């Protein structure tokens, strides 16, 4: 190959590589802040409120998933636990407070599972929209404890929030009040 053609080919390949790199950088800069938080390096851990699947925490745990719950919710749950224990039921949580990063990770997983953001939003809220991120919600670990809170939780203001999530509870009424009917799903 003559030298001028080789230079032309080398220049063309260099320009192509630069354009490709510029395109990648541009696409990367278009990611949303929520997506960036959800993909921060490192696995989810205690500081995110992560509780491994199949595990649960007692209400006296020192882990952030429990300790970062709203004090009123945690206090109500502990009072309910005392009554539940008298009936042979232990209240433990499968999820409590979560970091926004953890919540966004759960939402991204739900989108993959359900195929769309709309369908995923029936089951998981986005980042800061989640009551878990505010420390205002818990997911109860056992069916016995869910049943106990559904029957007696209003005594402490604790109510099931969504009809499609029998495990999800929040403070939704005054202690001794009446729980509102659960919303159909996370969309309200």
Predicted regions and their residues:
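Cell-envelope/glycan interface and biosynthesis
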Residues: 30-188
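Secretory targeting and sorting signals
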Residues: 2-29
């Amino acid at each position: 190959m003559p030298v001028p053609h080789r230079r032309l080919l080398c220049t063309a390949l260099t320009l192509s590589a630069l354009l490709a790199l510029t395109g990648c950088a541009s696409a990367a800069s278009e990611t949303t802040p929520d997506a960036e938080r959800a993909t921060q390096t490192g696995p989810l851990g205690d500081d995110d409120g992560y509780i491994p699947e199949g595990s649960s925490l007692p209400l006296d745990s020192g882990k952030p998933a429990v300790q970062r719950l709203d004090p009123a919710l945690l206090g109500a749950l502990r009072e309910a636990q005392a009554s539940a224990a008298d009936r042979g039921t232990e209240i433990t949580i499968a999820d409590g407070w979560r970091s926004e990063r953890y919540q966004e990770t759960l939402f991204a997983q739900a989108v993959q599972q359900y195929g769309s953001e709309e369908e995923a939003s029936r089951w998981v809220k986005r980042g800061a929209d989640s009551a878990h991120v505010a420390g205002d919600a818990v997911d109860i670990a056992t069916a016995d404890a869910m049943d106990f809170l559904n029957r007696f939780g209003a005594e402490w203001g604790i109510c099931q929030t969504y009809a499609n999530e029998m495990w999800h509870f929040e403070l939704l009424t005054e202690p001794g009040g009446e729980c509102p009917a659960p919303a159909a799903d996370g969309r309200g």
